[in-house]
Regions:
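Conserved SAM-binding strand-loop segment of SAM-dependent methyltransferases
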Residues: 492-504
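A short glycine-rich, Lys/Arg-flanked "PGG" loop and its adjoining helix->strand segment in the class I
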Residues: 529-541
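Rossmann-like AdoMet/SAM-dependent catalytic core
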Residues: 187, 191, 210, 577-688
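Conserved class I S-adenosyl-L-methionine
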Residues: 544-594
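Alpha-helical solenoid repeat scaffolds of the TPR/TPR-like class and their adjacent stem/linker regions
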Residues: 1-445, 460-463, 540
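Conserved SAM-binding loop of SAM-dependent methyltransferases across substrates and taxa
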Residues: 455-468
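A short SAM/SAH-binding and catalytic strip from SAM-dependent methyltransferases
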Residues: 514-527, 551
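A short acidic, Gly/Pro-enriched loop at the edge of an enzyme's catalytic core
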Residues: 506-516
Length: 688
């Protein structure tokens, strides 16, 4: 029990607010030892401080911080708690204690500490940031959004808070309009703070509640009425110039059934205007501001919008008319004609497309010419620079190759331009703090294999993330590889080598790697375990592997949808996919098809083919994965999943803090069958 004065204050508390004359030098000495990595010396000096100045909060703070840096996370909170008792009115002491509790995974205790810190100092952005982080860990999205927003109000250039904020709001949906939220989401899409696909659902929600935009969009049952009103006044211009609407159309396939139908009707309106010689000649800035991005959206989603036979005939006639006009001289071509044709057919498919590049065009047209002519030309030119490392002979491999030559997947536009790079071992320790991870010999400069790199999102992100890494990215499809190489050059990524190869033949290269990643690939092989064994054979001792497999449980609606598609005889062609989508939506009204019709992949033709029409698909169970891991000298490090999912798992299985018990995860998945709809994504390490 503390002895109190008559005024109710503890003498030690007052002492904690006085800085002894000789203390600063000793505190600085502790800090210097920590900065130089002499943590044992720093701990002894900090202990000396607490012995010399037991009533001084800074001494206990230094000890707590040193203990935390040494990894003695359980010993750190008592020292920092002592600092709080000595100086309860200092926000920093509460924040330090919150940091210690957060390291221990005691998020509710950390939340209380950070809440006290911001109450004492409501203008300290870092405390708000940490409060937002623990709210996020606890699944309190609304409270996390409020905290991160406060950080950005106090310090708009706080990079970590920007990323945390958009990652948080990407999981939320709102009922009332917020200008801050709207403009921030528009910036995040335009500048690609995170993958645009992660923001499109939120963007559709925000458009629907924007009082200046939603009247233009109509409703699910009356989209046509809103379309007819589009040409009144400057409505087209207002929509086209709206930063969020514009950024979404130009960045990512639209993931919203109502908005997709509205855009489909808007495309028909564009066709009707362009087919009319009088309307086509009136290609004013307002029309181009709206219809130009709409045509870009059509290219991005691979022309997935449904189209009647009559409409396609009219579009084909307009395309033929455009080709004739170009042959007679590009100066006679109406900009709106180009935009309308580009909304139905890729411009590179026109035999006379080079002539279009010879003329100066308004921005709305020039952007389309870059997207649909110049960039595909660059990809064709890059094909000859991509080496072939192995033959492709397996029948299934050849069928999969053919699919991705026809439909490179995904057709992404933007990725975050820069990611803070980290050493691979540090990254894994941050991902899986409760797991014992063996030392990776070449962690400082790892050799990385991306087996099945697709159109480049995966290798580009890995090349940026893993510090001083050298990446080999292979795929079956030359169309995908040339897209990936163009995008990597566009982003200035220089540590990736792209090559064509079959995973089944990679063992013939006699190469080994510190990190191997193959996400969403092995389940498309004739036998996934065969390919998996090839990759394990190429992994160095203590090397790590990131994999992604479809879940048998989570894909149940996809399996049912594939049965329905086969029953109706829809072909894996552009027309077949366009016909199947409304049919599946109709079935979903009476027989839920779950994520099969709600996945973002449903809203792009190439992605929908990958989702529902793939030529080869296996699905695994956690029992199969566990058996392979045990039989092939691997150890399970953990799943990459949302904090809320991990929190729910810990609530269900508190005795597994590392979250590595796959039998527990199998129970969890049975109870929560959509947990792994995307995929099982996890990390492994190869044992000696």
């Amino acid at each position: 029990m503390k002895h109190k004065t008559r005024r109710g204050k503890t003498p030690v508390s007052r002492a904690g607010n006085r800085l002894p004359a000789q203390a600063p030098a000793q505190i600085n000495a502790v800090a210097e030892c920590m900065n130089s990595g002499q943590l044992d010396v720093a701990e002894q000096q900090a202990l000396d401080l607490t012995r010399d100045f037991p009533g001084h909060s800074h001494a206990w703070t230094m000890l707590g911080i040193v203990l935390a840096q040494q990894g003695k996370v359980e010993a750190s909170p008592p020292a920092l708690q002592k600092a709080v008792e000595l100086m309860p009115g200092a926000a920093g002491t509460h924040a330090n204690l919150g940091n210690a509790f957060r390291e221990l995974g005691q998020f509710r205790e950390a939340e209380a500490c950070y809440s006290r810190a911001v109450a004492l100092n409501p203008r300290h952005p870092d405390s708000y940031f940490m409060l937002g982080q623990v709210h996020r860990q606890l699944g309190n999205l609304q409270e996390a959004e409020t905290s991160f927003r406060r950080v950005l109000t106090l310090q708009p250039d706080h990079q970590a808070a920007r990323l945390a904020y958009v990652r948080c709001i990407s999981l939320m949906r709102f009922k009332s309009f917020s200008p801050f939220l709207y403009t921030t989401t528009a910036r995040a899409l335009t500048e690609a703070w995170i993958r645009p696909t992660d923001l499109v659902g939120l963007a559709c929600n925000l458009l629907a509640i924007n009082p200046l935009i939603s009247p233009f969009l109509g409703s699910a049952d009356k989209p046509g009425r809103a379309i007819r009103k589009l040409c009144e006044g400057d409505r087209l211009g207002k929509l086209g110039r709206d930063p969020l609407f514009n950024a979404m159309l130009r960045s990512v396939p639209i993931y919203d059934e109502v908005l997709e139908q509205w855009l489909t009707d808007a495309r028909l309106l564009l066709l009707q205007i362009a087919a009319d010689s009088t309307g086509a000649s009136k290609a004013d800035a307002s029309r181009l501001a709206f219809f130009g991005p709409l045509a870009e959206q059509c290219f991005i989603n691979d022309y997935v919008f449904w189209c009647s036979q009559e409409e396609m005939q009219a579009a084909t006639a307009l395309r033929d008319s455009l080709v004739d006009a170009i042959e007679n001289g590009p100066e006679t071509v109406s900009p709106l004609q180009i935009v309308a044709v580009a909304a139905y057919f890729p411009l590179y498919s026109l035999n006379s497309d080079p002539k279009l590049l010879e003329r100066s065009w308004p921005d709305g047209v020039r952007n389309l010419l870059i997207q649909q002519i110049r960039e595909p030309q660059e990809e064709m030119a890059l094909r000859s620079s991509i080496p072939s490392l192995t033959p492709i002979e397996n029948d299934v491999s050849l069928a999969v190759q053919s699919q991705y030559e026809e439909n490179p997947y995904p057709r992404w536009v933007k990725l975050p331009a820069s990611i803070e790079s980290v050493a691979v071992d540090a990254y894994l320790h941050s991902m899986f703090p409760e797991v014992l991870i063996a030392s990776i010999e070449r962690a400082a400069h790892p050799d990385v294999l991306i087996a099945g790199c697709g159109t480049g999102q995966h290798p580009i992100e890995t090349a940026q993330l893993l510090k001083d890494s050298k990446v080999l990215a292979v795929d079956l499809s030359l169309a995908s590889l040339s897209y990936a190489k163009r995008k990597s050059q566009e982003m200035g990524i220089e540590n990736i080598e792209f090559a064509r190869a079959d995973i089944l033949k990679l063992g013939t290269l006699n190469r080994s790697f510190d990190v191997i990643e193959s996400v969403g690939v092995l389940h498309h092989l004739e036998n996934p375990e065969t390919g998996w064994k090839v990759l394990v054979s190429m992994l160095r001792p203590n090397g790590v592997m990131r994999l992604g497999f479809y879940s048998e449980i989570a894909r149940r609606h996809v399996v049912r949808s594939r049965e329905l598609i086969a029953g109706k005889g829809f072909a894996a062609t552009a027309d077949g996919i366009r016909q199947a989508r409304p049919y599946l939506r109709e079935v979903d009204l009476t027989e839920t098809l779950g994520c099969a019709v709600r996945s973002t992949d449903f809203y792009s033709l190439s992605a929908c083919r990958d989702l529902l029409f793939h030529v080869q698909e296996h699905r695994l169970t956690l029992e199969q994965i566990q058996d392979f891991i045990h039989a092939n000298g691997l150890s399970f490090l953990g799943f990459t999943c949302e904090p809320m999912t991990l929190g729910d798992y810990h609530g269900r299985f508190p005795d597994d803090p590392a979250a590595t018990n796959l039998k527990n995860w199998a129970v969890f998945e049975q109870e929560n069958p959509d947990t792994f709809f995307d995929m099982y994504q996890f990390w492994l390490q190869k044992r000696h």
